[in-house]
A protein has these predicted regions:
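Active-site beta-loop-alpha junctions enriched in small/polar residues
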Residues: 51-55, 78-82, 110-113, 140, ...
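Active-site acidic/histidine proton-transfer and metal-coordination neighborhood
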Residues: 14, 20-22, 40, 62-64, ...
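A short alpha-helix capping/helix-coil boundary motif
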Residues: 41-44, 72-76, 100-105, 125-128, ...
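Glycine-rich, proline-tolerant flexible connector loops at the mouths of alpha/beta enzymes
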Residues: 76-93
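Short amphipathic alpha-helical segments at helix-loop
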Residues: 79, 86, 132, 226-229, ...
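Hydrophobic faces of well-ordered beta-strands that scaffold small-molecule active sites
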Residues: 46-51, 75-77, 105-110, 135-137, ...
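Histidine-acidic metal/acid-base catalytic patches
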Residues: 2-47, 57-71, 170-173, 177-191, ...
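Beta-solenoid repeat scaffold
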Residues: 33, 95-96
């Protein structure tokens, strides 16, 4: 049985976590393009970030304000916050707003890409205007040849996002890895550790196995390994975060470790604060 660090060891109760965030101030979190920030003055070796989908029921300004509250400076963006239907100049203006807020844009998605060259080009144009260095996607396998060519043309990475047992094409990271391992290096994976676990696959082992094409990561926790509806705040479930972070450090992972907090969409901030605090605490402990 995997032994997880006690939540109390780091932060005590949820109220203590919230107090920790308030005391540390809005600017003392993740800082610097090469770091996940600091915890207790210790510089962290991974980029702990946030998927804007966690705040999908709130406007961009609120999402950026909450990121500041949590000290987050790395984010990926869903099209609810940077709409794909906006004209290019509007997309570029939103990009400028995000960057002015001190956020490093790590990518965008998830975008469902069909086997339609014209539509694929539109998605890459959108990504370019939005400042995405990476698109994470659930693509039609038949579209991969065109996606590969566009990735080369635009010099934008594309990471296939695994979606668990319900996915016809990409249930496990290994399914995506098999499709990209012989293609251009711009094609890789966005591993969703919760969806990975639900397939009966060890997320930690999957990260190590797919390490040379691991470009992005969605982080969540589950109380029950196979239950999509059992998501909880990070650290309250069964996923081995100490093992995950040790592995990511060991393989030299350079992408974002992005919290995707999908529950409590009408009031996500307390759970995001708790999750981010736990992630920082665990990372500080394993990096010592």
């Amino acid at each position: 049985m995997t032994t997880h660090p006690s939540r109390r060891e780091f932060f005590g109760t949820t109220a203590a976590v919230a107090a920790w965030i308030r005391l540390r101030g809005p600017h003392s979190g993740a800082t610097g393009a090469e770091s996940g920030g600091q915890a207790g003055g210790q510089r962290l070796p991974l980029k702990l970030g946030l998927a804007s989908y966690s705040m999908r029921q709130f406007p961009l300004d609120q999402a950026l304000a909450w990121a500041k509250t949590m000290g987050v400076t790395h984010m990926t963006f869903k099209d609810v916050h940077i709409p794909r239907t906006d004209p290019p100049e509007t997309t570029r203006a939103l990009r400028a707003k995000i960057e002015a807020a001190g956020i490093t844009i790590m990518g965008g998605g998830t975008i469902t890409i069909p086997n339609d060259p014209a539509q694929i080009k539109k998605e890459f144009d959108y990504a370019k205007n939005a400042g995405f260095p990476l698109i994470f996607t659930d693509p039609d396998p038949a579209a991969l040849d065109t996606i590969e060519q566009m990735a080369k043309t635009y010099d934008i990475r594309v990471a296939i996002h695994n979606h668990g047992p319900e996915s016809k094409n990409w249930p496990r990271p290994q399914d995506a890895y098999a499709a990209v391992k012989s293609r251009d290096k711009r094609l890789g994976l966005c591993i969703d550790i919760g969806h990975t676990l639900r397939t009966g696959t060890d997320p930690v082992a999957a990260c190590r196995e797919c390490r040379d094409r691991l470009y992005d990561m969605h982080v969540k926790d589950l109380a029950v390994k196979t239950d999509v509806n059992s998501q909880v705040a990070v650290g309250r479930g069964v996923i081995d975060f100490p093992g995950l972070f040790r592995t990511l450090i060991d393989i030299g992972y350079q992408g974002q470790v992005g919290l995707e907090y999908e529950i409590n969409p009408k009031d996500p901030l307390p759970g995001m604060i708790e999750s981010m605090a736990y992630m920082r605490g665990v990372l500080a402990a394993v990096a010592t």
